[in-house]
Regions:
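Conserved pre-catalytic core of RNA-dependent polymerases
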Residues: 1-178, 182
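Mobile genetic element proteins and their domesticated derivatives, centered on retroelements
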Residues: 16, 32, 44, 48, ...
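Catalytic palm subdomain of template-directed nucleic-acid polymerases
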Residues: 106-124, 202-231, 248-250, 283-285
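Short, conserved secondary-structure transition motifs
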Residues: 141-144, 243-254, 372-377
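Short, conserved micro-motifs composed of acidic
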Residues: 237-270
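Basic, alpha-helical interaction scaffolds
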Residues: 263-337
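Family-specific functional microsites
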Residues: 306, 468-601
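Extended C-terminal regions of large enzymes
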Residues: 319-325, 348-349, 360-509
Length: 601
C-alpha cells in the first residue's frame, strides 16, 4: 500500500459523535466532535506517523519552539522556559516582559489541506512515496454525524487535519512551524538566552501559542506577522480568548502598552492560564495554587461519592485512587512553583484523611496525617523540582530549557535570585550540596529514592516535635512510627474509625482530663454519683453507667483492677488486634450514646 501511495476510500470515512461540553445545547460551538475511524487505518497511520516523525526530527523540520507531541518534550518544558524568560526581566530593577497568549478558533479544523501539502513538499522536503500517501489520505475525506441511533449521510470534508488520526498532531505541528520561519524573516527579534543566535520568538505546544517580547513595539510587530500568517494560511484567532500579560514587579499597565490584531485591541489581563498553570503578572503563584486546589477538591468529591456508593472500598484503595487522580492535579507544574509548602495544597490531603477517619476540626491536622500514614504534598513537590532539574542536566544544549537554565545560573552567580537559586538552596538544605557542585547525580533513579527518603526522615523528626500539646504526649507513646495503624484499614465502618481515632488522640468529649497536669472544664463525672474525675480510666473501667456494655466489649483483664498502665496497654494492644479495635469502637459508640442521652435529660 505504501509502495503504491494509494489510501483506501473506506479508511477516509469517519463517524462523528457530538459531545456536549457546556453551555447552551443548541449552540454548535458548545460541542466537541469525537470521530470514530477504521481501526486498520489507525494502525497504518501509526506506521506513517513514526516514519514522518523520525524524518522531521532528523531534518529539524519542527523548531525547538514547538514542544507538542514530541518525544522528551512536555508542557512543563514550555512552562519553565516562559517562567525563565520572565525571571530574566523581573530580577532587574523596573524590568518588564510582554507575552501574547494566542487562542486559535478550531485550529485543527481550519488547516488548508492544499497549503499543508504544499508546505510539506516545498519547505520540509517530504516527497516521493510519503508525499503520495499523505496526498491520497486527504484526497477524499468524508464524515457523517451520529446522534443516538440515527446517522446522517456521508459528506465531503475539504479542510482540517483528520480528527481521531494519530498523524494529525504531527501534521499540524509542521503546518504551524512555518510561523517561526516568517517571524525570523521579519524585523522582529528574539529574547536572548545564553547561546541561541536567534533567541526565543515564540513558544508553541500544539496549537497553544505564546509570542514573547521585551518591548511594546517588537510585540506589535510579532502580532502583525501573526496576522499576515493567519491570512496566508487560513487560520483564525479567537480574540475573546487571546490576551496579553504585562509581567512586572508591581505598578500599573502604562498607557503606551496596548496592542492590536486586525484593527481590534487585544485585552491586557493580570494573569493567564497557560498550559494549565496560571501565570500572574508578578510571577506570583498563589492564584495558580488556588486553581489547582479547587480542581483537586472536585476530584476528591468524586472519590467521596464513590466511597459512599460502595461502602466497602478498602482504605488502601481509596488512598491509591487519591494518589492516582488527585495528587497529579495538586502537583501539576510544581516543577516551577513547588519550592515551598502551600497550605491550600496540603489542606486537600488533610481533609481527605479526616474524611476517611470520620473526624473534623477536633483532631489536629498533623495527627490526622499520622493516623493515615501520609506525608505532606510538599515532599513530592520538592522531588519533582529536583527531578526536573536532573532532566535539564541531561538535555542537549539546543533545548530551550537547557539554555534558559544556563542563563539563570549566570544570573544567580551575579546575585539575581531565581529558579536556580531555589534549586541550590534545597540541595544544600538537605545535605546534597555536593550534588549541586557536581551539576549532576549519576544514577538519577537511585538518587531520587535517597533524596525522597531524606525528606521523609526530616519530616518525621519535625512531626514528633510538632506534637507539643499535653494531650498529644500519650499519643506519641503508642504511635511511634509514621505508619498507618491497622484499625484504619481493618475497620470498614467510618463510625468505628472515628471512635478509635478520637480515643487515640485524646479527643473524646469527656468532662475533664488531668493526667497531664492540665485540667479542662469541670472534672467531675456527671453521669454517675461516684463524684469521680471523668478521665479515660473512669470512662473505660469504672463508671457504673457503662457496666453492661463494658462487660460486653472490654476484656475483663483491663477493668478488673483498673489503672492508667492498663489503659495505655489497651491502646498499645489495639495496634496489633483488629478484633480488639472493633470491640473498643463498639464500646465507645455505645458509651457515648448513653452519655449524651443522660446529659440531655
Amino acid at each position: 500500500m505504501f509502495e503504491s501511495g494509494i489510501y483506501p476510500e473506506s479508511w477516509a470515512k469517519a463517524i462523528i459523535f457530538p459531545l456536549h461540553k457546556k453551555g447552551n445545547p443548541r449552540c454548535v460551538d458548545n460541542y466537541r466532535g469525537i470521530s470514530l475511524i477504521n481501526i486498520t487505518s489507525k494502525l497504518y497511520s501509526s506506521v506513517i506517523n513514526k516514519r514522518l516523525y523520525v524524518f522531521s526530527e532528523r531534518n529539524e523540520c519542527i523548531p525547538e519552539a514547538q514542544a507538542g507531541f514530541r518525544k522528551g518534550y512536555s508542557t512543563v518544558d514550555n512552562i519553565f522556559t516562559l517562567q525563565s524568560l520572565v525571571e530574566k526581566y523581573l530580577t532587574r530593577k523596573g524590568g518588564r516582559f510582554f507575552t501574547l497568549f494566542v487562542d486559535f478558533s478550531k485550529a485543527y479544523d481550519c488547516v488548508n489541506r492544499r497549503k499543508l501539502l504544499y508546505l510539506l513538499l516545498k519547505k520540509t522536503g517530504i516527497h516521493g512515496k510519503m508525499f503520495s500517501t499523505l496526498r491520497s489520505m486527504y484526497s477524499n475525506v468524508k464524515s457523517s454525524v451520529r446522534i443516538d441511533s440515527k446517522i446522517t449521510e456521508y459528506f465531503d470534508c475539504f479542510s482540517g487535519v483528520k480528527q481521531g488520526c494519530v498523524l494529525s498532531p504531527l501534521l499540524f505541528s509542521l503546518f504551524l512551524s512555518e510561523l517561526q520561519s516568517e517571524l525570523i524573516n521579519s524585523t522582529t527579534k528574539g529574547i536572548d538566552i545564553f547561546s541561541d543566535p536567534i533567541g526565543v520568538l515564540l513558544l508553541m505546544y500544539a496549537d497553544d501559542l505564546a509570542l514573547v517580547s521585551d518591548n511594546v513595539i517588537d510585540l506589535q510587530r510579532k502580532i502583525d506577522c501573526l496576522e499576515k500568517y493567519c491570512n496566508k494560511w487560513g487560520l483564525t484567532v479567537n480574540m475573546s480568548k487571546t490576551k496579553v500579560v504585562v509581567f512586572k514587579n508591581g505598578g500599573f499597565v502604562k498607557e503606551s502598552e496596548k496592542w492590536y490584531f486586525g484593527g481590534e485591541k487585544v485585552q491586557v489581563v493580570a494573569d493567564y492560564n497557560y498550559l494549565g498553570v496560571i501565570f500572574g503578572s508578578s510571577l506570583n503563584w498563589s492564584k495558580c495554587v488556588k486553581n489547582l486546589s479547587a480542581k483537586a477538591r472536585k476530584a476528591v468529591a468524586g472519590i467521596k461519592r464513590l466511597q459512599f456508593t460502595l461502602v466497602s472500598i478498602p482504605v488502601n484503595t481509596l488512598f491509591k485512587i487519591f494518589d492516582t487522580k488527585v495528587k497529579p492535579i495538586l502537583l501539576y507544574g510544581s516543577e516551577v512553583w513547588g519550592f515551598q509548602k502551600y497550605d491550600e495544597i496540603e489542606q486537600v490531603q488533610i481533609k481527605f484523611c479526616k474524611s476517611i477517619l470520620g473526624v473534623g476540626r477536633d483532631v489536629k491536622n498533623i495527627v490526622a496525617m499520622g493516623e493515615c500514614g501520609r506525608f505532606p504534598i510538599f515532599i513530592d513537590s520538592y522531588c519533582r523540582v529536583i527531578k526536573f532539574w536532573c532532566k535539564i542536566m541531561e538535555m542537549n544544549d539546543k533545548r530551550y530549557p537547557k539554555q534558559c537554565y544556563n542563563m539563570l545560573v549566570a544570573h544567580d552567580k551575579s546575585g539575581r535570585i531565581n529558579w536556580v537559586t531555589k534549586i541550590r538552596n534545597i540541595l544544600y538544605k538537605y545535605g546534597y550540596g555536593f550534588v549541586w557542585e557536581a551539576q549532576g547525580v549519576g544514577d538519577s533513579n537511585t538518587f531520587f529514592k535517597i533524596f525522597k527518603q531524606r525528606l521523609i526522615d526530616n519530616y518525621k523528626q519535625d512531626w514528633d516535635s510538632m506534637l507539643d500539646n499535653p494531650l498529644d504526649v500519650e499519643y506519641r507513646n503508642y504511635h511511634i512510627t509514621l505508619e498507618r495503624p491497622k484499625y484504619v484499614d481493618d475497620l470498614i465502618s467510618r463510625c468505628h474509625r472515628r471512635s478509635i481515632c478520637l480515643l487515640r488522640c485524646n479527643r473524646l468529649e469527656l468532662n475533664a482530663l488531668v493526667r497531664f497536669g492540665e485540667q479542662l472544664g469541670n472534672p467531675i463525672c456527671n453521669i454517675c454519683n461516684m463524684n469521680a474525675i471523668e478521665d479515660y480510666c473512669h470512662f473505660f473501667f469504672v463508671c457504673p453507667a457503662y457496666l453492661k456494655i463494658r462487660r460486653q466489649y472490654v476484656p475483663i483483664y483491663y477493668h478488673r483492677f483498673p489503672s492508667t498502665f492498663k489503659y495505655t496497654l489497651l491502646l498499645r494492644n489495639m495496634n496489633e488486634s483488629t478484633a480488639l479495635c472493633f470491640k473498643i469502637a463498639n464500646y465507645v459508640n455505645a458509651a457515648m450514646s448513653i452519655r449524651r442521652s443522660r446529659l440531655s435529660m
